[in-house]
Regions:
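Ribokinase/PfkB-type carbohydrate-kinase core domain
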Residues: 5, 11-30, 37, 41-182, ...
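Conserved phosphate-binding/catalytic region of the ribokinase-like
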Residues: 98-99, 149-248
Length: 248
């Protein structure tokens, strides 16, 4: 579910998603109000990146863009916190979560950006209480609950049920109620850190979807993230399923 213009970038995005095997159910918007979003990313020699992002038409995502059949049939719904800035984006999230839950699915979010959390802290806190899982890094959790990390995760687990905290090269913490898994991370110097958070979420959610334990799901997220930071670009260049099997 998303929103792109019918310009060159929008058509390329929709076509590439379909080519990769993912249905992009919202066709490019003819004469859309803004151009398709884009991001210019500068990668320094230490692999860290600085992003200059224009959200464009994506920021206009609203409840009418949420497909009943898609959100209402999802076993796992994943929301992207970057689109939570505008009222219509918040309405879209709430509608998608409601449709997913009515059908018995699980809905969650990646907090995405501590500055976005700062801007909408109260709304995020309300949203988290309606979700089944939340993924964030240590800075985003601290921003959301305005306390130390341990206390923030305890509060988050009480609110959302399942919470994940990534810590940029340090152990990942996964907590559900009183159950906590600490997943070790092998520190490496990245070639390009772009996409690390997205790929962690992908690996982790694939683990949950296939019935893996919290620790195994966390490990799968780490394996996926490690692959994408080993080369330039935000998409994996290796068969991740094969990599999961290789890593045990």
């Amino acid at each position: 579910i998303g929103r792109v213009h019918d310009d060159a970038l929008g058509k390329f995005y929709a076509q590439t998603m379909a080519k990769e095997g993912t249905d992009f159910v919202n066709p490019p918007v003819p004469g859309g109000e803004l151009p398709t979003s884009r991001s210019m990313i500068f990668v320094s020699p230490d692999g860290e990146r600085s992003m200059n992002t224009y959200l464009g038409i994506s920021s206009e995502l609203g409840p009418d863009d949420v497909s009943d059949s898609v959100a209402g049939s999802a076993e796992i719904l994943f929301l992207e916190g970057y689109l939570y800035d505008k009222p219509k984006g918040k309405q879209a999230f709430e509608r998608a979560v409601e449709l997913c839950h009515k059908a018995g699915g699980k809905a969650g979010i990646a907090l995405s950006d501590p500055f976005c959390v700062d801007r909408h802290r109260d709304d995020f806190r309300r949203l988290v209480k309606s979700l089944d899982y939340v993924i964030g890094n240590e800075h985003e959790w601290a921003s959301l609950y305005q306390t130390d990390l341990s206390t923030a995760l305890e509060q988050a687990a009480a609110d959302a049920g399942l919470v994940v905290c990534t810590r940029s090269g340090h152990d990942v913490i996964v907590q559900r109620g009183d159950e906590q898994a600490v997943v070790p991370v092998t520190r490496v110097v990245p070639v390009d850190a772009t996409g690390a958070g997205d790929q962690f979420a992908a690996g982790f959610l694939y683990g949950l979807a296939t019935g893996q334990s919290l620790s195994t799901s966390g490990r799968m997220g780490c394996v996926a993230a490690a692959e994408v930071i080993s080369h330039f670009g935000a998409r994996p260049e290796t068969d991740l399923k094969a990599l999961f099997h290789k890593e045990g």
